[in-house]
């Protein structure tokens, strides 16, 4: 595994709270999948906040949470009060559950929310290949993706006035740490990366090393197999992010930062 695993999340409660702030945006897919879907598999479910939010709203559906962090899964299971939620620390254990409860994989949708960038930050090359194999070849009817992501053309010179605003209002040492890991913020791609990251001061030693933007929009699209067709696509800036960056630096982010894909199995 990556050396980043030597920098664990120092405050799981704060981490989970941060992740839950975009909860409404994360459930964008629920009105876009057809009624043959009986099971949602939430890959990288953390403490289960997302599916515990959905479970009472859709009592006829099953929500399965997976996270390789066993402490997260323990928290999720301990907090769960819904019979239509189950949690696993192995991504393939749910297949046994499906067979035991007589659900087909073609009745399942895979939700991958804010996970792809973590896979690339914390995994070996082989583990990344295994991840995409799981995504493409398990047989899910839908693959749902939401993550931080920029277009390839975001690599361009940063605006001089934006650089001045950042360097005048943030720790020079922290900026230097970021640039040592990810490159100069004179590249607009890296500047936006920094603006996605700067707020996480409590977990900074972990967060500064994590690559939030390892994959461009175009790259992610290229990783989905030919057996799936694109059903939905959206690329935007989260209003919360735009507002907080404007407040803290008086900078208007001009590139879309969060992408959503829904792919459907052909045939």
At which residue positions do the language-model features occur?
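A general structural motif
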Residues: 35-37, 60, 104-107, 140
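Short amphipathic alpha-helix with an adjacent loop that forms part of the alpha/beta core around
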Residues: 94-105
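Class I (Rossmann-like) S-adenosyl-L-methionine-dependent methyltransferase catalytic domain
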Residues: 1-55, 66-84, 88-95, 138-267
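A conserved beta-strand element that flanks and buttresses the S-adenosyl-L-methionine
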Residues: 111
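Hydrophobic adenine-recognition pocket in adenosine-nucleotide-binding enzymes
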Residues: 115
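Active-site catalytic pocket residues across diverse enzymes, especially alpha/beta-hydrolases
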Residues: 58, 80, 123
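Conserved S-adenosyl-L-methionine
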Residues: 56-62
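A short, conserved alpha-helix within the catalytic core of class I
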Residues: 119-135
């Amino acid at each position: 595994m990556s050396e980043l695993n030597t920098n664990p999340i120092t405050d799981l409660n704060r981490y989970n709270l941060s992740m839950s702030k975009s909860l409404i945006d994360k459930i964008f897919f629920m009105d876009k999948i057809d009624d043959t879907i009986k099971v949602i598999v939430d890959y990288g479910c953390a403490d289960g906040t997302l599916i515990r939010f959905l479970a009472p709203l859709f009592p006829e559906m099953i929500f399965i949470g997976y996270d390789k962090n066993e402490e997260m899964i323990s928290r999720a299971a301990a907090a769960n009060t819904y019979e239509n939620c189950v949690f696993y620390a192995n991504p393939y254990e749910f297949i046994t559950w499906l067979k035991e409860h007589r659900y087909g994989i073609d009745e399942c949708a895979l939700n991958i929310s804010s996970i792809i960038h973590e896979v690339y930050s914390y995994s070996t090359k082989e583990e990344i290949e295994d991840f995409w194999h799981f995504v493409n070849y398990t047989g899910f009817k839908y693959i749902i993706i939401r993550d931080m992501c920029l277009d390839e053309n975001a690599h361009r010179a940063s605006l001089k006035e934006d650089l001045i605003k950042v360097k005048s209002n943030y720790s020079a040492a922290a900026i230097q740490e970021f640039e040592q890991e990810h490159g100069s913020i004179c590249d607009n791609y890296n500047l936006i990366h920094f603006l996605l990251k700067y707020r996480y001061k409590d977990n900074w030693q972990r967060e500064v090393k994590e690559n939030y933007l390892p994959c461009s929009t175009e790259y992610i699209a290229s990783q989905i197999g030919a057996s799936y067709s694109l059903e939905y696509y959206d690329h935007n800036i989260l209003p919360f992010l735009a507002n907080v960056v404007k407040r803290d630096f008086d900078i208007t982010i001009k590139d879309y930062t969060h992408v959503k894909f829904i792919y459907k199995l052909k045939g």
